[in-house]
From Swiss-Prot:
Family of this protein: Belongs to the MinC family.
Keyword list, A-Z: Cell cycle, Cell division, Septation
Subunit structure: Interacts with MinD and FtsZ.
Domain of life: Bacteria
Cell division as UniProt keyword: yes
One annotated GO biological process: cell morphogenesis
InterPro entries: CAP/MinC_C (IPR016098), MinC (IPR013033), MinC_C_sf (IPR036145), MinC_N_1 (IPR055219), Septum_form_inhib_MinC_C (IPR005526)
NCBIfam families: minC, PRK00513.1-6
Any Pfam family matching the protein: MinC_N_1
SUPFAM superfamilies: Cell-division inhibitor MinC, C-terminal domain
Job of this protein: Cell division inhibitor that blocks the formation of polar Z ring septums. Rapidly oscillates between the poles of the cell to destabilize FtsZ filaments that have formed before they mature into polar Z rings. Prevents FtsZ polymerization.
Gene name, Swiss-Prot/TrEMBL: minC
Entry protein name: Probable septum site-determining protein MinC
């Protein structure tokens, strides 16, 4: 019998995993099935870009974190993209400070979670173990070492900028990645944005983005 609960197929940039959440009891049931399916070709997925297409409304923030951790740690996925199968349309931001912006004048410490529907500007560091969620852009006037998700409603036009960019995990819109495990640490501000289906990090040139 053909299993249509999870379908994995190749695309031009990597692999698609089409998941029908309605066919699973809950998130744990789906995750177990996905891991079983991916385990059959574990070495094949190493270093690839995986796009997960499903009904995103059935997965909460903690479950997204668990799913991404499994894909990055267990299967060594390079990049992970989430696409809503219901194809909701989102309005993009066109500038780094467009829309509502909240300023946080302190360091965000491990265990702290900050959420804001607009842009976030943090006048301090974002420590490892902390979490930042913004509907728009995230600007860190310090070191970024925690988890950050800009454009949480699928806004791929959002950006993340920091004086020192070394996040545990970085997500813009529906595209997620991790910082490279090397010793190269640029001594200048950087900005992360989505290009195609990949997050790219470039030197931050204020006149270009503001």
């Amino acid at each position: 019998m053909l299993d249509n609960n999870i379908i994995i197929k190749g695309n031009r940039d990597g692999l698609n995993a089409v998941i029908n959440m309605n066919n699973f009891r809950d998130f744990d049931d789906m995750l177990e099935s996905l891991m079983e399916k991916l385990s059959k070709g574990r070495l094949f997925y190493k270093g690839c870009t995986l796009k997960i297409i499903t009904e995103l409304k059935y997965i909460n923030e903690r479950e997204f974190r668990r799913l991404k951790d499994v894909l990055f740690d267990e299967f060594l996925i390079k990049d992970c993209i989430f696409e809503d199968s219901e194809e909701k349309v989102n309005k993009p931001f066109s500038g780094i400070y467009e829309g509502k912006t909240k300023f946080i004048r302190r360091t965000v410490r491990s265990g702290q979670v900050i959420r804001y529907p607009g842009n976030l500007v943090i006048l301090g560091d974002v420590n490892s173990g902390s979490e930042i969620y913004a509907g728009g852009n995230v600007i860190v006037l310090g070191s970024l070492r925690g988890y950050v998700h800009a454009g949480v409603r699928g806004n791929r036009k959002a950006v993340v900028a920091a004086y020192f960019m070394q996040p545990q995990m970085l997500q813009v819109g529906d595209v997620a990645t991790r910082a490279p495990e090397d010793n190269v640490k640029p001594q200048y501000p950087e900005i992360a944005k989505v290009r195609g289906d990949t997050i790219v990090v470039e030197p931050y040139l204020p006149n270009k983005f503001i």
